Amino acid sequence: MAYNCREVGRSESGPRRGTRGMEQARNYVCTECASAVPSGHKFCGACGANVPAEAQTLATRFFGALQMPGKARLIVVRGDEAMGEGLSYLLQATEHVAGREADQIPFPSDNWLSPSHANFLYRGEKLVVRDEGSLNGVYIRIRGTVPIQIGDHFMCGQQLFRVDATPKDTSGPEADQTYFYASPRRPSAFRITQVLEGGMDGIVCCAREQSVQIGREDCDINFPDDVYMSPRHARVEMSGESLALVDENSQNGTYVRIRGERELSHGDYVFLGRNLLRVEVTA
C-alpha cells in the first residue's frame, strides 16, 4: 500500500502532532488556557491573561557562587599544619576579615598574625586587601619592578628586610680635638637592613654605587642556607632620586609590605603571618 505525507502523522485540517507541545517548551505557558506565550509578551494572545512579572524577567542563574564573574577566592598555598595546604575561602560577602581570631578567614594557630590582621573587601568590582593595623603587616608578591621608599619592608625567601637611609656623617673630634680612628666611610645612597625575630637589626649592607643584590650566593648579601631563596633573588636599586625593588625571576617571589590597602588581581600572592595565599578571580 502506498502512503502520502498527509496520511502519516498528519491530517489535512490540523497541525502536525507535537507542534503545540514544542511551542510550549520554547515559551511561557499560560496558566489559564495552556497556550504558549512568546518571550517578551505581557499578555496571553489566546485568552488575554497577564503574564507574571517574574516570567518576563527570568534570568539564568549560575550553578554556584564560584561561577559568578568578579568573585574571588583565596587558596592556602603554604600554611600551618592545623589549616593545611589547598584550603580555599570563597569571598562572596562584602568584607572578609583574616586573623588569629577572625570569623571569616581564621588562622588560630599562627602566632605571627594579629587577632584581626587584614580585610579582603570589594570596592565596586575590584578586590582589595587592607591592613587592619597588624603588627607584622600584609605582604604582596611583586611583578617585576615596583617603586619603594625609605622605611619599606620586603621579604625574600625566609628573610625580612628594611630599606634605610644612610646615616649622616656625624664624626668629629673629641673635646680635646682628637679624632677617633676608624675605617674610612664609603659614600652610599641607601642601605638594606635584615630584620630579625623580635624586631632586632641583623645584617646591614650599604649600597655599593646604586644597588644592593640579595640572594643565596655571589651577591652583596648572601644567605647560603635559605633553601627558599634563589641564587640571585632580588635587588634594590636607585635611579635618580627614586628607589625600586626588582625581582630577579626568583622561584618563590619577592614580597613587599603594603601601606594601608592594595588592589588585588587574579594570580596575586599574599603573605599573612606564616600563611601564603593565592588570589583567584572568576573572569
Could you say what each language-model-derived stretch is?
Residues 2-9, 13-109, 121, 147-220:
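Intrinsically disordered, low-complexity acidic Ser/Thr-rich regulatory segments
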Residues 87-150, 156, 204-274:
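Forkhead-associated
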Residues 161-165, 277-283:
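Edge beta-strands of extracellular beta-sandwich domains
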